[in-house]
């Protein structure tokens, strides 16, 4: 799986908020945990290899800082669309996806994408990011 190094000059999303007011996954990113992989890297790698990504139209929910987006793009999908609700993170992933795809600033529940526009949908850490209201 491809790796992606983060520029230290780019502020993380919600970096301006106190820890108690920032979403948990962005607090973890401040501490150096920039990728949420429930089940670990081995499970993520296993699942992505079996998803038949080369030549597919891929949508990824909550790509965060774009580490998995870079890995997906590295195997040659026909297209890639990230759906990220944080505008700073969406901008980062949009830059990573340029040339192959894009990242839209939207909620996974209302992406704005046409029905049946993806062959593969990736939601690597979606459930781990849901609050009590989910």
What kind of feature is each model-predicted range?
Residues 24-39:
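Class I SAM-dependent methyltransferase Rossmann-like catalytic core
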Residues 123-126:
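A short beta-strand submotif of the Rossmann-like class I SAM-dependent methyltransferase core
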Residues 55-64:
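Conserved class I S-adenosyl-L-methionine
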Residues 109-120:
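A short acidic, Gly/Pro-enriched loop at the edge of an enzyme's catalytic core
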